[in-house]
Each structure stands twice: as structure tokens, then as C-alpha cells.
Amino acid sequence: MSQQFAPRDAAEAARAAFASVEGKPFPDDIFTAPQLTWAVIGCGVIANQMASTLELAGRKLAGIYNRTHEKAVAFAEKYGVARVYDTLEELCADPAIDAVYITTPHNTHITYLRAVLSAGKHVLCEKAITLNSEELNEARAIADEHGVQLIDATTILHMPLYRELIRRAEKDEFGNMSIAQVSFGSYKDFDPENRFYNPRLAGGAMLDIGVYALTMARMFMLSQPEDVVSIANACNTGVDVTSGIVMRNPDMQMAVISLTLHSKQPKRAVLSFENCYIEVMDYPRADRA
């Protein structure tokens, strides 16, 4: 099947990119959407995208914290951010901030999650949201204790294309899905000190790109996989660089996933149903299938 689900304009793209704290899309008029006051942790590419997207909606970030204060000041000047925090504690103590977007590398996430959620603020957190299930369960428990929302920012979870495909799958338009085949490959020059290959920075294919592939497959499976088999190659720093993963759930649906940081591979997903197959190219950023 080939059908396009492209945002009609910039405002629609902004609506699609940001969910309300209830986990639902903003209403059609983004200017009357719930007005949370946002701060951001980090000032890299993703933080810049956040600030730019909010500007499309006629809004601004209210605060920023970054470990390198000078970079935070420059970011604030660029986007008109009112507050630059000297410390994480200062951000957490600010009653004017409702929600925080954590955009830093994933090895830092749990530290920020503990602090921000404990301060009673909603959190949108970049992928990988945590390094393992123990950290995620801890963060969820803190969010529940303080009555706030913790939202995974993995793009696939918030894209209009997949909401539409899931809606149609739930109406049984496609029939039962038997298998999902998902690949993601990207060649990264080896540097034992960079975030892709350094174990101290939680490097490796699984945490960097595997999040997309696993999320893509899991979204269309009816139940949690119980059988998981994987084979991985590691580089000399010990992190995984190439892997093959096969999963099966109690509904006898399977997923076959291939990941690599050592070669080019299409970001391609094929979902095989009884009545059709759905192919999605560049699935982490797709607007058509």
C-alpha cells in the first residue's frame, strides 16, 4: 500500500510533535492547547529543535539548564529564553516551570529524571529514556508518587502516520499481522571516546538506534514478546555494534530486527498482514507507507 500522511503546514507539524500531559494530541487550535511552561535540559541539536518548534506555535521555552553554563547563556540569547539556571536544583525548585524536556545523552537521563520528577514536574525524555528496565521502573514509580507524567519522546510513538496505521489495524482492515521485519544501519567511524562506542557513555547500537527498531515492531504486536533470541558482535570497547534479534509473543506474532553501526542499511520496516503488507521507508521520520 502507498499512502501519504504528510503534515499540511508548520503549525500542524508542531501539533503532531508535542503531546499534552494526558498523552493525547493537542486540539486543532494549538494556541488554545494546554499551556504548560517548559524548560529544557541540554542545548544540543534536539533542544534547538524543541525551541524552534515551540516558536512555530507562538510559544517560547521558559528556562534552560546545561552543565556548561556559557552554552546555556548562548542558547537563551538565541531563542529568548527567560531563565538560565546555574544548577539543576535551581531548575527543580522553580515553581514557574510545569514540564521539563530532557535532551541530553541517555547515560545522564536517570539522574535528571530522579531530580525533576521528584520536584513534581512533568517530563518529556529523549530516547533511550533509560538504560534498562530497572531505571525505567524507578522513574515511573517516582512519577506516580508525585502525580506527574513521564513521556517517552521516541519519535515513532508520536507520529501521525503510525496513529493512522494503528487505528486501521485495530479496525481489522489489514487482518492479523504475522511478522514484522525492521532494520536500521548507520556507519559510524570508530572512536573509543565518542558516544557510539564508549561504554561509559552507554554506547552501542541497541541504545542508539535499536530503540527505534524495537519500538516500531512492538507497536504493531498484540502482546509483549516472551521469546527473545539475539546474537551480537561487539567492538573492542565491549559495546554492541551489530546484532540480529528475533522475538515472538503469545499471539504467535514475530519480529526480526537487524541493527548495525558498522555499515549502511536502510531504515526499513515491513509489516506483514493477512490482507496486505505495509512497507515504511525511513520509519523513524516517515510520513507515508
Predicted regions and their residues:
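Contiguous beta-strand/loop segments that form the cofactor/metal-binding neighborhood of enzyme cores
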Residues: 2, 6-22, 215-286
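N-terminal Rossmann-like dinucleotide-binding module
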Residues: 2-79
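Beta-loop-alpha module in the N-terminal Rossmann-like domain of NAD(P)-dependent dehydrogenases
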Residues: 50, 79-141
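Hydrophobic residues in well-ordered beta-strands that form the structural core
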Residues: 85, 125, 150-152, 280
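Rossmann-fold dehydrogenase core element
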Residues: 137-155, 176-180
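Predominantly a Rossmann-like dinucleotide-binding segment in NAD(P)-dependent oxidoreductases
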Residues: 156-228, 236
